From Swiss-Prot:
The gene is PRP45. Involved in pre-mRNA splicing. It is found in: Nucleus. Residues 1-31, 181-226, 302-341 are annotated as: Disordered. Belongs to the SNW family. Residues 192-201 have a biased composition (Basic residues). GO terms for cellular component: spliceosomal complex. It comes from Debaryomyces hansenii (strain ATCC 36239 / CBS 767 / BCRC 21394 / JCM 1990 / NBRC 0083 / IGC 2968) (Yeast). Residues 302-318 have a biased composition (Basic and acidic residues). Keywords: mRNA processing, mRNA splicing, Nucleus, Spliceosome. It holds the Pfam family SKIP_SNW. One of its GO terms (biological process) is mRNA splicing, via spliceosome. Associated with the spliceosome. This is Pre-mRNA-processing protein 45.
Amino acid sequence: MFSSLLPKPKYSSHEPTSRIKLKKVRAHEKSNQLVKLPENKSDIKVTHNPSNSESTISQLHLNPDGTLNYNLTIASSNSNSRKVQSSYEDTIPLKVKFPNLKHHFPRYTVETCPDDSLKECVEDTKAAINKMINEKMGVDEKTNNKKDDVTYIKYTSNNLVNDPEGSDDERGRERIIQIRNYQEDPMLPPKFKLRKNRHKNPSPPPPLLKSSNNEQTSKLTKEDQAKWQIPSAISNWKNNQGFTISLDKRMVAANGGSELATNDVNLEKFGELSQALENADKQAREEIKIRSEMLKQLAIKEQHEKENKLKELADIARSKKLNNKRPPNGDYDDVKKKTKY
């Protein structure tokens, strides 16, 4: 198959055969005959059985080497208006096959289109969209086509309402009502608000009542009545209604409805605790005083030691100075008088 894509040889007298034609013959003739390919260019007629009406191949095209060219054979069997993709290259898109190809396809409008195909397409599309809109809105085509769909109703009012005097004139009591279907705008916001079906808490269980027998019933005491008194809920954070609530009621509500209990103070234990705290305070003060005295004595002792060291160093320096200034011949007392300390 690839030999057909090669160029024609220059230095040879080889001429490939062009085609093999099929010719229809009569039914009594047989067409199953082998035909030899000629060496020179010529047309070969091949007969086939005309009873096989399903076959659409009318010509067989051959390659230069004598093999059947399927591409040309399939293309010739179809009409000229149809394009046959007989190879892999035919399936490749043009944008992939020629990436740098610049093409300008004609874009017609309704006015510039040579035929009425574009106009028909626009009308069909418009009709389909209108049909879908009418189906959504629930409007029939018959009612939509009628522009003046108006009905009139004649109505006669009651004597008691419009004519209190009781006159029998029907002309003054006749009314004509006009009924017209107005189309509603589908883009208007909804008129009714849809509320969610919020599930409420179930109802409380039924109360357990006492029996009506006089033997088992007993009168309520004050203690039982006080237990059944439930105080109102008072919040320390919210007061939407703005009520003024006294402090004692707020304290009762904060304690869960029970009254404030007074706490008794144990005086004996409290006295022992205060005495123990006083003793601990005294002991701590004495320890601090002793510690401060010891630190003071140590500081005085260190100061005396430093003074003694300084005196010793001064005496040593003085003796060295006297030894250096003493004359070799002379009275020591005269020199001592002249020196100034």
